[in-house]
A protein has these predicted regions:
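Active-site beta3 strand of CheY-like receiver
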Residues: 49-55
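Receiver (REC) domain alpha4 helix and immediately following alpha4-beta5 loop
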Residues: 94-95
Length: 95
């Protein structure tokens, strides 16, 4: 399959370990996976490429995933990109 026919996926997370883990889950021969470490970095990639899916970390310093999604939805070029929100934040559960 030529590179032109690959689906482009964007993963946005400020933690390199999370980027690697998500990449390992979704990468295959028919996908090109792009990484961004911040909302600003993601916006630059969104202007350059047409993505089939964006996976956004909810909690990042600066622009969080929800703010990035709001900007994406407000722009014609990116408003129809499906978004998946992820978070590595844990919480103590008292059962």
């Amino acid at each position: 399959m030529s590179v032109q026919n690959h689906s482009k996926l964007l993963i946005v997370d400020d933690l390199p370990d999370n980027l690697r883990a998500l990449d390992a889950l979704i990468r295959d021969d028919q996908r090109l996976v792009f990484h961004a470490h911040s909302g600003d970095e993601a916006l630059a990639l969104l202007l350059e490429h047409e993505f089939a899916l964006a996976i956004l970390d909810v909690q990042m310093p600066g622009m969080d995933g929800f703010e990035l999604a709001e900007l994406m939805r407000g722009t014609e070029r990116t408003r129809n990109i499906p978004i998946v929100f992820v978070s590595a934040a844990g919480r103590e559960l008292n059962y």
